[in-house]
UniProtKB/Swiss-Prot annotation:
PROSITE patterns: RADICAL_SAM (PS51918). GO terms for cellular component: cytoplasm. This is Probable RNA methyltransferase BAV1540. Its EC number is 2.1.1.-. Binds 1 [4Fe-4S] cluster. The cluster is coordinated with 3 cysteines and an exchangeable S-adenosyl-L-methionine. [4Fe-4S] cluster binds at C107, C111, C114. Keywords: 4Fe-4S, Cytoplasm, Disulfide bond, Iron, Iron-sulfur, Metal-binding, Methyltransferase, S-adenosyl-L-methionine, Transferase. Its main location: cytoplasm. GO terms for biological process: rRNA base methylation; tRNA methylation.
Amino acid sequence: MRFSDFDLRLAAFGAQPVHRGRIARVWLNGQALDTGTRRRHSEHFLPLALREALPALTAELDGLARVHSEHAGSDGSRLLVALADGQMVESVLLPRDGLCVSTQVGCAVGCRFCMTGKSGLIRQVTSMEILAQVVLARRRRAVKKVVFMGMGEPAHNLENVLEAINLLGTEGNIGHKNLVFSTVGDRRVFEALPQQRVKPALALSLHTTKAELRARLLPRAPSIAPDELVELGERYARHIGYPIQYQWTLLKGVNDGNDELDAVLRLLKGKYGVLNVIPFNSLEGDDYQRPDLERIREIVRYVHSRGVLVKVRNSAGQDVDGGCGQLRARATGADQVVTLRRAPRPQAVQA
């Protein structure tokens, strides 16, 4: 179910825009639908037909998603979320009141270093199911930032994701720059985002400056050369007034050489953006491994000292074997599941 469908149902119960907005706000804050205002109880505010429908509506909303299991970790608690049809997605409670949500069950891009991509795309996550992940998190703690970096490629579920972003940036009371749309790069994204009422921050999965290598690592991503992707990102960054996050998963011996670093400096120097280097969350038996800690430090120092802002981001859930897609793979017993190895707890990396 999409939120637009739910909104029409509220209208059918006699709810005016002010009533529908109130219902959306209290739900997105994790509160009961009959929560009143400071001055009035809901029985003096909501239409009678809507009040009588609230128990059934509450049951329906609660049935959208539930926490199947919670896995606490030093870098954030990962929630395995069961949807109404039994499919599962993952959400991560991040430090500083952040939340990472999933936008698809599985993913069609098939990134070679991502567990989610191994299962392929199973189905889209609706806007209501995306919002339900936020509701579940807010019933546990405050959520002031939502990043669309969980399972799935948001660009492949654009209507549902944009609808969720619009609700979170209005009725959900989250600042627009604290809503982060993450994508491998799709021209539809650069066409759609500038036209939205709520214009989110943008994270672009760059990973390499070499077009051929990027095509191998992200086999079903749109064919956009890295330099063109950066130019598209720069145009959007200048339009909205906050920087692009360029994502770079560090793979030992693949994209961590000085030739790559020099090339990324040429691409990003002077651009309104930040390079997020993400040491790979190692999987036993996988083709890829993360660079050692000293090499990661060298990379950060090298890039930072030459004028490009760089930050180290570690994939949340490493100490609970919970990198993106891993909990779902274990829970569903997917054929593609490999034996997981806990990566060493990341140490602080000094620039």
